[in-house]
């Protein structure tokens, strides 16, 4: 059973599932299944199917089924009904799911190199980041080993857009973060912590209730277009883009055993569709941002972008703390973090040419519409 040499030109999105041979219509058992050649993959995703990432995965699955002439089908589980966000890696390896979105933020220390895209105050260009990660997981041996050593096959990358902080308190300056109870998980939230915020780790499914009951004042780490999928426009008085840059890169992945169980033809179809994933996600994300813009306008929520001088204050207090912590983690894993970051930055810069207008945030685009 050979290791998967990660697919050529993998894409920018994410999914999850458990490999099951589909039962034949006449139900005559294993012989009929083998003759039919159809597989049903259990797909798992830990939040709503209404957000732009989920919409991308739905389109991805439809395309895989169509292009495989029905030889690959999917049994879909949404809202964490099969695997929670922190259960995906083990669930893919032990076969509870065949394909699922792996979000490294939920696995501290296990994806140290991958977490380079969590370093704050970088680009908002999610397409460029996703494309760069697709390239690097093929070309960089250390990054590839980070995934293959855990029996995971990354297929398509997705990157959360620049975080729009939904809040019940106005945030107009860096000082406004002091004492603010903010939901946060990734390294960008640690920059807020360094500026005096009280960062609280909560799963997406806990956000509405926690904010509604006053357990938190604000939500960080959810892209602008996905906020309405959590109904946060109903309970947020303000949404501010703090210009911390794009968030965590996640990947649609399969366990190695499930991947090896597919035929060469089926794997080729998955690779082909994954190569189209960045454009799928770009379209879904822009549509979701437009819908979010409308939803927040209708709810009367005040949108803003933090002034550049205030962003610099956030950066001065938080960036070095976060970067130094990441470098130490990467060194502990046996890698040269500074060298890898240079490689990553160069890959993102090269990929940005294919996404020329990708650095403007969803909040900024919404405000520009007037």
Predicted regions and their residues:
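N-terminal secretory/targeting leader peptides
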Residues: 2-8, 13-17, 21, 26-128, ...
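A gly/proline- and charged-residue-enriched helix-loop-helix capping module
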Residues: 124-144
């Amino acid at each position: 059973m050979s290791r998967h040499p990660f697919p050529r030109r993998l894409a920018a999105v994410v999914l999850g599932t458990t490999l099951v041979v589909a039962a034949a219509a006449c139900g005559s058992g294993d012989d009929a299944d083998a003759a039919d050649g159809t597989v049903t993959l259990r797909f798992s995703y830990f939040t709503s199917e209404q957000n732009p990432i989920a919409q991308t995965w739905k389109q991805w699955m439809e395309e895989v089924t169509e292009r495989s002439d029905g030889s690959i089908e999917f049994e879909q589980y949404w809202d964490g009904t099969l695997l929670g966000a922190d259960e995906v890696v083990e669930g893919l390896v032990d076969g509870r799911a065949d394909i699922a979105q792996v979000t490294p933020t939920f696995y501290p220390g296990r994806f140290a190199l991958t977490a380079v895209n969590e370093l704050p105050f970088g680009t908002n260009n999610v397409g460029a980041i996703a494309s760069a990660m697709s390239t690097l997981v093929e070309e960089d041996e250390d990054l590839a080993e980070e995934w293959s050593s855990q029996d995971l096959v990354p297929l398509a990358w997705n990157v959360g857009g620049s975080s729009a902080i939904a809040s019940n308190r106005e945030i107009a300056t860096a000082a406004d973060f002091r004492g603010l109870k903010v939901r946060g998980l990734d390294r960008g939230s640690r920059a807020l912590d360094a500026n005096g915020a009280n960062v609280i780790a909560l799963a997406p499914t806990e956000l509405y209730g926690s904010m509604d009951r006053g357990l938190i004042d604000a939500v960080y780490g959810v892209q602008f277009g996905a906020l309405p999928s959590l109904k946060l426009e109903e309970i947020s008085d303000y949404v501010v883009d703090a210009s911390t840059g794009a968030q965590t890169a996640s990947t649609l992945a399969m366990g190695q055993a499930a991947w090896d169980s597919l035929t060469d033809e089926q794997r080729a179809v998955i690779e082909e569709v994954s190569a189209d994933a960045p454009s799928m996600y770009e379209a879904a994300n822009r549509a979701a941002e437009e819908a979010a813009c409308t939803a927040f306008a209708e709810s009367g929520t005040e949108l803003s972008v933090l002034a550049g001088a205030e962003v610099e204050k956030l950066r001065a207090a938080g960036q070095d703390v976060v970067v130094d912590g990441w470098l130490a983690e990467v060194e502990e894993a046996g890698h040269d973090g500074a060298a890898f970051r240079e490689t990553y930055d160069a890959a993102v810069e090269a990929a940005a040419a294919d996404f020329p207008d990708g650095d403007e945030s969803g909040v900024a685009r919404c405000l520009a519409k007037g």
